[in-house]
């Protein structure tokens, strides 16, 4: 036994002897860093000190001359550069890039091309020693280590794929605002998201290599720039402050207009008042890192006042853009093309832009999704060549039509990847901003989004499933992470079919018949599928509960937040609504639906006050944002209409990737069964099936409810046994009824009846894409009478 231990010890020692940089527990380390480094670098060093102490139980000291780790921002004026005799050419000319390189004599170099690059390099060291970016925000307590090593010759050089990468805190009324003002910094008046909270947000952003921030802006929240200490905190962390589509010129209009504006927020009838409102803020923040949103909408996510037609609105916007740039030229930089600006064609503004609005060449055009993950416009060749470049404003949380999804963070990571990769490939590479709601519980989607913005090639090469697995293994260990992967994939798949928030078959903002749309109704599914869905969710929930019992005590809080609450919350919401549907038809006792509701209440109480972190997240989680009817205990009513019957005349049913032949690109994880495909423009896929004794068949096609990639159309044709149809369209417009139905079921639907010969022994049905952006999910052939 002693011989075995000695041999093992010698093997370990030999490994360390070969390593060129090594750290042992119990040994303090010194970091060499110039006092001239900017504040964000020192903030990163503070975080690394904390991380090092948590992992190795020892301290980090900063020195001007001697140390194990050398931290440097390359500059012609930095004396450390000459003494190192290192080739820094790989960093020169790049923004926010860093190099980590093992040197001789057990030293490690962390070099940045600028302040951000150096800070990100330091945070990369934290990741390398095993600290999760979510160590504070999801209570992923770092594991203790005995040692850390890097081999001889180790070097990594990283630079961002997207220049500005950030998050938007939004719809904060029931989560972050209440948590901040009632729990985390309660010594100020309610409604305040102050510098203590924002520092935690900026720490997270630094760990996730984000540099762009849209602060919370609802009427319930004290505006960012009116809260003492917020501006200064952003400067310390090197954060660029921006604003949403209705917050031009760094002004949180929803609240600030009523505080410091005069008259109506109307550039037709009160241009001087609005101009002075903007001027006051620009003068105040002129020396800070601001990405100025330009343009104008209504006070809070509505159309501008004073102009009714598209033509009138375009003329007003042209004047607005001219005057706003005049302010920037006067107070920020006389060369206005050097002031970062962004124009956001959101909702009705896209129609104004498409009518011929001229946006200055140096301004970034920030395109938007439809609030449910499907991008409405991709840059044309001309737009891709603009000096200002292109950006994206994307949602994984939303308040609005056809229904909110603010609660559980079930947005499909596979859809996020597919749409953003397509956006990047089509030139959207300047700015990415993600609407994250309250941050929690969208932790994984945030990390995936920002990882793509940092290194899109690496995420693409790995794939989303491998990225998710790495996330789970990092947070919960190799074995449990591997076990969790299929569970989380199934969790996202079931929510892809219908989000938990959509399970009441209700809608919001239907002003003409609001009572009907707010009333919980039957889902359009058969009894068989309803039972299957409950079984699938129960299986997930049971597996999660078993794993929870195996999680070490120091990671139980993290597991509850990242896995248990979202999976079991979604399970109970589905059970509540499905059991209620059976009860309405007299096929089940109402108590089972009520019990599911009670389980949601209990889970949420645990999240806020009952887990081991002793109320750290109290007021953060609300299972009924906006108090919508879908979140209530279901009212006990009876109905006489029969439930939807199972389709009985099916000839064949396929997921798109199960086609017999053809040209297609698989879409990892997308679709009802995760087997959707992209059919390239001009290509087709084929489905072969045997003889049928019918003279007509019904062809049902289910597509991703996406928007055109080029031009204004999504078209395809069907050919059955050599006979082709005319062009079939399935694009949607605005907030049409078809678009709403598509979003709620997450499929676009087309059905066509075709004649068929009963004399043929086999048949071939071909689906051909006429436009780019055709994503087929499923196909069903049914007998037609």
Indicate where each model-derived feature is located.
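Contiguous, structured surface segment used for ligand recognition
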Residues: 20-159
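The substrate-binding groove and active-site-proximal loops of carbohydrate-active enzymes
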Residues: 109-112, 175-176, 180-195, 211-221, ...
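Bacterial Sec-dependent N-terminal signal peptides
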Residues: 1-22
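Extracytoplasmic
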Residues: 617-785
């Amino acid at each position: 036994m002693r011989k075995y231990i000695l041999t093992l010890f010698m093997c370990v020692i030999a490994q360390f002897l070969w390593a060129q940089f090594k750290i042992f527990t119990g040994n303090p380390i010194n970091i060499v860093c110039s006092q001239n480094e900017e504040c964000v670098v020192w903030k990163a060093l503070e975080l690394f000190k904390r991380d090092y102490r948590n992992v190795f139980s020892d301290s980090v000291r900063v020195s001007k001359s001697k140390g194990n780790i050398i931290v440097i921002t390359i500059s012609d004026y930095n004396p450390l550069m000459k003494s190192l005799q290192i080739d820094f050419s790989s960093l020169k000319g790049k923004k926010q890039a860093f190099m980590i390189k093992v040197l001789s004599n057990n030293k490690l170099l962390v070099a940045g091309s600028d302040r951000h690059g150096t800070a990100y390099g330091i945070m990369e060291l934290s990741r390398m020693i095993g600290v999760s970016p979510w160590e504070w925000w999801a209570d992923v307590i770092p594991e203790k280590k005995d040692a850390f090593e890097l081999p001889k010759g180790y070097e990594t050089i990283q630079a961002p794929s997207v220049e500005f990468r950030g998050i938007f805190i939004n719809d904060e009324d029931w989560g972050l605002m209440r948590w901040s003002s009632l729990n985390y910094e309660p010594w100020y008046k309610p409604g305040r998201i102050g510098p203590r909270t924002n520092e935690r947000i900026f720490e997270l952003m630094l760990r996730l290599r984000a540099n762009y921030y849209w602060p919370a802006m609802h009427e319930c929240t004290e505006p960012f720039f009116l809260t003492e200490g917020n501006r200064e905190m952003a400067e310390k962390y090197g954060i660029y402050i921006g604003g949403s589509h209705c917050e031009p010129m760094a002004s949180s209009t929803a609240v600030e207009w009523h505080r410091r504006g005069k008259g109506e927020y109307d550039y037709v009838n009160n241009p001087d008042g609005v101009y002075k409102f903007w001027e006051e803020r620009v003068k105040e923040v002129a020396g800070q890192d601001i990405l100025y949103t330009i343009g104008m909408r209504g006070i809070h996510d509505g159309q501008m006042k004073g102009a009714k037609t598209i033509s009138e609105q375009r003329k007003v916007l042209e004047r607005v853009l001219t005057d706003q740039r005049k302010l920037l030229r006067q107070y920020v930089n006389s060369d206005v093309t050097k002031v970062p600006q962004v124009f956001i064609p959101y909702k009705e503004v896209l129609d104004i832009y498409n009518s011929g609005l001229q946006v200055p060449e140096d301004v970034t055009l920030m395109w938007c999704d439809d609030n449910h993950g499907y991008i409405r416009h991709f840059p044309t060749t001309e737009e891709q060549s603009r000096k200002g470049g292109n950006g994206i404003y994307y949602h994984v949380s939303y308040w609005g039509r056809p229904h909110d999804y603010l609660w559980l963070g079930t947005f499909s990571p596979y859809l996020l990847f597919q749409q953003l990769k397509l956006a990047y490939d089509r030139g959207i590479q300047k700015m990415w901003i993600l609407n994250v709601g309250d941050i929690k519980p969208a932790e994984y989607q945030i990390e995936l989004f920002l990882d793509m913005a940092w290194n899109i090639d690496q995420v693409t090469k790995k794939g989303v499933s491998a990225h998710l697995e790495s996330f789970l293994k990092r947070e919960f260990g190799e074995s449990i992470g591997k076990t969790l992967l299929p569970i989380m994939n199934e969790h996202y798949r079931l929510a892809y079919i219908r989000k938990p928030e959509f399970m009441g078959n209700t809608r919001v903002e239907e002003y003409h018949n609001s009572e009907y749309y707010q009333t919980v109704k039957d889902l359009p599914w058969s009894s068989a599928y309803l039972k299957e869905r409950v079984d699938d969710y129960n299986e997930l929930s049971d597996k999660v509960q078993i794993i929870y019992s195996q999680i070490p005590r120091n990671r139980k809080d993290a597991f509850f937040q990242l896995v248990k609450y979202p999976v079991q919350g979604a399970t109970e919401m589905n059970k509540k609504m499905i059991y209620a549907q059976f009860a309405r038809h007299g096929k089940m006792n109402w108590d089972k639906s009520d019990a599911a509701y009670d389980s949601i209440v209990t889970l949420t109480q645990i999240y806020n006050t009952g887990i081991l972190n002793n109320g750290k997240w109290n007021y953060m989680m609300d299972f009924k944002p906006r108090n919508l009817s879908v979140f209530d205990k279901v009212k006990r009513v009876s109905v006489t209409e029969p439930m939807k019957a199972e389709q009985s005349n099916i000839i064949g049913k396929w997921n798109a990737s199960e086609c017999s032949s053809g040209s297609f690109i698989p879409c990892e994880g997308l679709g009802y069964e995760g087997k959707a495909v992209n059919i390239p423009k001009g290509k087709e896929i084929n489905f072969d099936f045997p003889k049928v004794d019918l003279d007509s068949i019904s062809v049902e096609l289910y597509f991703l409810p996406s928007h055109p990639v080029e031009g204004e159309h999504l078209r395809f044709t069907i050919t059955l046994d050599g006979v082709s149809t005319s062009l079939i369209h399935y694009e949607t417009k605005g907030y049409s009824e078809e678009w709403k139905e598509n979003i709620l079921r997450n499929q676009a639907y087309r059905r066509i009846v075709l004649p068929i010969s009963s004399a043929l022994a086999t048949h071939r049905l071909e689906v051909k894409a006429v436009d780019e952006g055709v994503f087929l999910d499923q196909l069903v052939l049914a007998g037609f009478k």
